[in-house]
Structures are given as structure tokens and as C-alpha cells.
Amino acid sequence: MKYGKIRIEDGFLVFTRHMMINNLPCKDIVWAYMRKEGTDEGDDRQLSVNYLVIVTRRKKRYKFDMTEKEIHECIRILKILNPDMATGFPKGGRISLQSLPNTRDLGAIVTADDRHILPRRLLRSGELYHISESDKNRLREEYNLKTVIDLRSAEERKCKPDTIMAEVEYYHVPVVDEDVQVISNREQFVKMLAGLPDDIEEYMIRQYRNLCMDQLVLKQYARFIDILFRQEKGAVLWHCGTGKDRTGIGTAFLLSLLGVEEDVIYEDYLRTNRYMEPKLVYMQRLVQTWPEADEKMTEKLPIIYNVKEEYLAAVFETVKKTYGSMEKFFQTVFYLKPKMIEEFRNKYLI
């Protein structure tokens, strides 16, 4: 099968480089994606060119220009020949699932040393209680989901248990196991809103700061990282309730451990606001119809579905003040020496 200047024959990607024919085993390709260069907009009109980018186990990159149709077909065939190959360039974006609004692939997020997280390996999410059959199938088949880490409390899991998927291993790593209020009906929801303080931002900053000073909480995040460290194949998905606070802090620790710069970590953290906006708007309209709910309750709703940069900043500031740096934090709390950190990075970066 020929695609532009390359062809696939007998499990090999065949192409010419420097007047020599190369036979690259398809099994050696770890990542394939489409990249578009140039623009056809504005006064400086340039030809827009599509490229198939191939990354190998030896971290070599090859780029081939071809049509968009050829690229998609080529990636499809490569995926059949090598099911473990990562595809796409999500850059931390949302996975377009029907039933899960805040499930994201951290793949293609760039690190400070210009490496990328491999796509379809690290997935952050909200709860899986209402996951649809089609979404389950997609996570298993397209993302090769092998492990789910539930960061919720035992009571939360009892109220809204994860939907069990075949051939997926489940871990319960409760970051906070007692203080999380479980909401299962309208009366409890109203009571929860009424109980939130008026200085809600300061309250959340204190909550975040307290979380990263609690040794039991940090022990659970260390366990979360340990599970990722031991993962051999397939994708890992971790989640809490809405996928913003406990998941957000854990993801920030993970991205920092992988060498991602803080401004990029904040970008990932704040994406929750975009993906949870429809749910927030719906709940604001709904609560306004409840006679027992007042205006203050409606104003407090964003705290359930939104995050702010100041919350995560409190985590980084507290950790650095307590341990001196993120590196010392990882060594002291997660027991990860520099050699182990590099081993962890080599597992998930390319």
C-alpha cells in the first residue's frame, strides 16, 4: 500500500532517505500523528502542507508530506499492524465522549526539555458513574484503557460507584476519606450550598493549602504516582467527582514530575472551566427554579464546577515553602530519586 512517498509492506514502513531505502518495522513506531504547516489565510498566503509525523522507539522523528486522506488511511493501517502505537496530538484536550464532560488526554503536552507526553497513556477525568456503553467501548478499544484510579472517598464510591469495565484494573486511592460531603438529592445539594462560606475563594485556597500539608493526603498522592510508575501497557485514567480539585492537584503533581513548566500546568488545570461550563449554566438555571434556594446559593454554584489559578498557586507555594523545591518534594514525599524520576519520564515521554 502506497501513501505519498512511503509504502507499507509486510509489516514495514518503507521510505527513502538520503538516497537510501529504509525499512522501519511498524512495531517500532510509538507515535503517529498529522501535522499541518503553513497557512492559506491573510496577506502572506502560503501553501498549507499536511505531514505524517512518525516517532520511533529510538526517539527518531520522520516527517512525510501527503494528503490528509492519505495520512488518516496510513495511520489506520499502522494502528492495525501496531495496536500499541499512540495516535493524534491532543495536547491535553478533551476526549469527545458522550457521557463524560471532563475526560482529557494529557498526550502531546510538551515538557521543559522539549519532549512530549505520549498520547493515550495518561487520562484525567471526572466520575465514571454514568458512563455510556459507547464511551466504555471507546476507552477500552481506542485508548486501550487498562487501569482506573478512583480518588474519591469510600462514601462517594458507595453512592456513585464506578461502572466496571472488562479487563480494566481498579484502584481505590481516597485522597480525602472523611470530609467529603456526598450529595445524592436536592435537599442535600441545597444544604451544601447554604453551608459554604461567603468568602468562597479564600475558603478554597485554604482547602488546597491544607490538602498539600496533610501527610495522609500526600501519602495517597504518592500511591497514585506509584501506580503510574508500575503501569506497563495501555492507558491509566484517574478521577474524583467532577475531575477538578483532587484530580487537578494530582495531575499538577504528575505534570511537574514529568518536567512540564508551571504555566503549561496552569493551562491544563484551568481547562476544567471550559469543559464544565455547560453543566454550570444548566445547574444555575435549575437552582433558580427552586423556591428554597436564594440568590447567594446561585452565586456559590461556580465553586462546584470551576477552578481558579489562585487555588493551584496555593499548592505550589506551600510545597516550595515547605520542601524548598518541587524536586525535593518528590524525593521527600514520593521517595523518588533523580534516577527514578528520569526512569518515570522515559516511560511516558518521547
Predicted feature residues:
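Cys-dependent protein tyrosine phosphatase-like superfamily
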Residues: Y3, E9, W31, E41-L237, ...
